[in-house]
C-alpha cells in the first residue's frame, strides 16, 4: 500500500494542473491577447451578431455571393456536424451532385460560358469553409452587378478590396470571405436584397 498514496497524490496533482489550472491559464491568455479569436471570431452588424468569419453561411439569394457547397448533416454549414461527404471521386453520387451544381450555377450565371470554378461545386473537408477563391467570386460578379444594378467594375473592385492573401504568399492562394464580402456589398449597393442565409 506504500505505493498507493503517492500514486493518488500524483493523480490529484496532475488533474488539478492539466484539468483546471492549464485550461484556465490558456483561456485567460487567449481572451487577453486574442479576444476576438477566443470568442469565436464573431462578425457584428451594429449590436447584432450576424455570423463568424470562421464558419460559412448558406446564402441563397441570387443578389448575394454564394460560398462552397456544404456537406454537413441536417442542414448546410451545421457547425455541430462538421465533415465532408466522404464520397470518392469515382462515386456516381459525387458525379451526380457536381453535375447538378454546375447546371444550377450556369442557370444562375447565364453570361458566364467558361468553366465553373471547382470550389463552387465541391464541398470542403470540413463542410464549413467561409471563403471562396477569387475565381469563384469573379465568376459570380456579373450576376451580382446585374441584380444590384452596379457597374461590373465596381463589384470587382469590391472583391479586390476584400481579398485575404495567403501568408506567406507562396503558401496557398488568395481567397475572399463570403460573409464579409456580402456585408460590404450591402453597405455599398443601393439595391437591397433580403438576406436569406442559414446561420450556424
Swiss-Prot record:
The chain crosses the membrane at residues 6-26. InterPro entries: KdpC. Its main location: membrane. One of its GO terms (cellular component) is plasma membrane. It is a single-pass membrane protein. PANTHER family: POTASSIUM-TRANSPORTING ATPASE C CHAIN, POTASSIUM-TRANSPORTING ATPASE KDPC SUBUNIT. The system is composed of three essential subunits: KdpA, KdpB and KdpC. Part of the high-affinity ATP-driven potassium transport (or Kdp) system, which catalyzes the hydrolysis of ATP coupled with the electrogenic transport of potassium into the cytoplasm. This subunit acts as a catalytic chaperone that increases the ATP-binding affinity of the ATP-hydrolyzing subunit KdpB by the formation of a transient KdpB/KdpC/ATP ternary complex. This is Potassium-transporting ATPase KdpC subunit.
